[in-house]
Amino acid sequence: MTAQQNTSLASFTGDAQPYGGGDPYADYRTADLPFTQYANLADRQLGAGVVAANDEFFAQRENLLVPEPAEFDPEHFGHKGKVMDGWETRRRRGVSAEQPWPTEEDHDWALIRLGAPGVIRGIVVDTAHFRGNYPQAVSVEGASVAGSPSPEELLADDVKWTTLVPRTPVGGHAANGFAVSAEQRFTHLRLKQHPDGGIARLRVYGEVVADPAWLAALGTFDVVALENGGQVEDASNLFYSPATNTIQPGRSRKMDDGWETRRRRDKGNDWIQYRLVDRSQIRAIEIDTAYLKGNSAGWASVSVKDGEAGEWREVLPRTRMQPDTNHRFVLPEAAVGTHARVDIFPDGGISRLRLFGSLTEDGAARLAARHQELGG
């Protein structure tokens, strides 16, 4: 099965120039990609992994999901050749001296488990530093397989794979972006490079669609968490770090793992607006300022609105924040809503926001219907 693809994005083909010294990213090819506003479903922090690959002779498959940009050291060689920060396979060969070239069908593949199943809006196949050893073309397929399947189970004949990115030429040392229009919920991807070569990073942008049965079994859960389907809709300032960090799993591990704004020189304040998993009852709030010591928010408040046209209602009044501290608040009564907003005064940052509660009856019904509609 093949999904329709939007081909209006900038595309790159052909070799990059050999590295000539200096900043290796100086001639890196990239473009503005509209889907990068969505969460990276292949984020290791969400639990993503590269579960198998048919070949990783020169560089390991796990490099595909490293969160930082690929690095390049022109002097770093190992026993198998140049050490590259990505997934790189050996050069394919034909079957005989008369046919030394790989066939049209030859390719290498890697299986990726998404950290959070969801609807994919765009994919970036990044060939940073693979200037003459990138694949001629790539393709990407998606599947929805329940549970924790093994590589053998994913490769079984009865697994239905949907083409998300048809076989498409790519460029070396470039961020090759592809819009995806398949309205389905996927759990796994199969990345193919034709016929061989190297890919530095893979990013899979989309909307998380959580399993409603799992959330129902939990009872009380974080209704704004990224892994449960919460989203950042807007923010006043993203100067130092993305607002999505505030709804990532776990505690912040360092200062830039949270959200920090530039210094304000006016009388305003900074804020983030979120869309909850669906309509929810919020009973408790956590605001964490971990690792924000001289730059944490001075005060914070939380508001909720019920529906797109609803009015904002403050459920946590402006409250003093302490640096590098997790603040917990039990609400006097449950706050019902579909959206939430945190305001910080006057600027600074928070590392995490947690809104603990449960779906309302109609919210749970809508989530279950969407999950079923998307093939979950």
Swiss-Prot record:
Gene3D superfamilies: Galactose-binding domain-like. One of its GO terms (molecular function) is allantoicase activity. Pathway: Nitrogen metabolism; (S)-allantoin degradation; (S)-ureidoglycolate from allantoate (aminidohydrolase route): step 1/1. The keyword Hydrolase applies. Its EC number is 3.5.3.4. Keywords: Hydrolase, Purine metabolism. Pfam families: Allantoicase. InterPro entries: Allantoicase (IPR005164), Allantoicase_dom (IPR015908), Galactose-bd-like_sf (IPR008979). The keyword Zinc does not apply. PANTHER family: ALLANTOICASE (PTHR12045), INACTIVE ALLANTOICASE-RELATED (PTHR12045:SF3). Belongs to the allantoicase family. NCBIfam families: allantoicase. This is Probable allantoicase. It comes from Streptomyces coelicolor (strain ATCC BAA-471 / A3(2) / M145). The lineage of its organism: Bacteria, Bacillati, Actinomycetota, Actinomycetes, Kitasatosporales. The gene is alc.
